[in-house]
A protein has these predicted regions:
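Bacterial N-terminal signal peptides
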Residues: 7-16
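Acidic, glycine-anchored loop motifs typical of Ca2+
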Residues: 95-101
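Beta-strand signatures of extracellular beta-sandwich domains
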Residues: 44-48, 90
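A short, amphipathic beta-strand motif
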Residues: 29-36
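Short strand-edge motifs at loop-to-beta-strand transitions and within beta-strands
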Residues: 73-77, 129-131, 140-142
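Sec/Tat signal peptide C-region and signal peptidase I cleavage site
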Residues: 17-24
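A short tyrosine-centered beta-strand micro-motif
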Residues: 85-91
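Short, flexible loop/turn segments at beta-strand junctions in immunoglobulin-like
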Residues: 79-82
Length: 148
């Protein structure tokens, strides 16, 4: 009887092990994008490790770039195997999928955009230092809001 009880307890304990392992994400920077106004187009997440090209030249100067399809007005970017360091992130909702942040004739963005630390620039994009954050090599979960 004791052996049977021990067997059942062991089965119950180990039955949950694969589920708990599946829930733990690989170490990296995991970003949930908020305030996406629609599911049209894609979201581009650009991770920069230096001020060079931040944030305008995200396709050419970013350390890592992810382009994610939007589902039900939600998107998530997961950057894994990222070395320790200081980073800044820029996110663009590319509604027409032309690979750039569209603007009106005054230069004001007509598509959604956002920066880490919810950084804002005075008359343009924020500086790298305003948007930068330290990354220690462990799991980092962030949320970023888009502005239209």
């Amino acid at each position: 009887m004791k052996i049977r009880l021990f067997t059942w307890l062991a089965l119950l304990m180990f039955a949950h092990l694969p589920a708990s392992l599946a829930q733990s994400a690989c170490p990296g920077i995991h970003v949930q994008i908020l305030n996406i106004r629609n599911s049209t187009g894609t979201v581009a997440c650009a991770l920069f490790e230096s001020p060079a090209g931040f944030p305008v030249e995200y396709l050419h100067s970013a350390t890592n770039v992810m382009v994610i399809k939007i589902r039900k007005s939600q998107a998530r970017c997961d950057f894994e195997d990222i070395p320790k360091g200081t980073y800044a992130m820029a996110v663009v909702h590319d509604e027409n999928m032309n690979g750039k942040l569209d603007t009106n004739w005054l230069g004001i963005p007509t598509e959604g955009y956002g920066f880490s630390n919810d950084a804002k620039g005075l008359l343009g994009a924020p500086s790298f230092s305003a948007a930068s954050f330290p990354y220690d090599g462990q799991n980092l979960d962030m949320t970023m809001s888009l502005h239209y």
